[in-house]
């Protein structure tokens, strides 16, 4: 018997909420940026491993149809660093330390 749309929608929403919570463990990532990561098609912190922060930034700008503040690139650099390394330098977990 096929799932009802409401059941499927609830499953998707549950998955989304779990992913958003997962993203918020990354320093500098809150509700808004976790939504941006979801909208980029990422579903877990591990999806950020070895991603190109510049490409994520460019894709987000295209998705939103506007220029995104450059600080978002710095957050993406920090997030990719966090996801790609098991041991972290505390200074590199501050997004502002990823400026050009």
Language model features with spans:
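C-terminal extensions
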Residues: 2-27, 31-100
């Amino acid at each position: 018997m096929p799932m009802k749309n409401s059941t499927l929608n609830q499953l998707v929403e549950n998955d989304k909420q779990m992913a958003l919570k997962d993203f918020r463990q990354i320093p500098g990532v809150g509700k808004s940026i976790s939504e941006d990561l979801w909208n980029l098609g990422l579903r877990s912190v591990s999806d950020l491993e070895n991603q190109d922060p510049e490409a994520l930034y460019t894709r987000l700008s295209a998705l939103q149809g506007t220029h995104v503040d450059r600080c978002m690139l710095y957050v993406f650099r920090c997030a990719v660093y966090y996801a790609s390394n098991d041991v972290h330098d505390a200074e590199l977990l501050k997004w502002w330390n990823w400026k050009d």
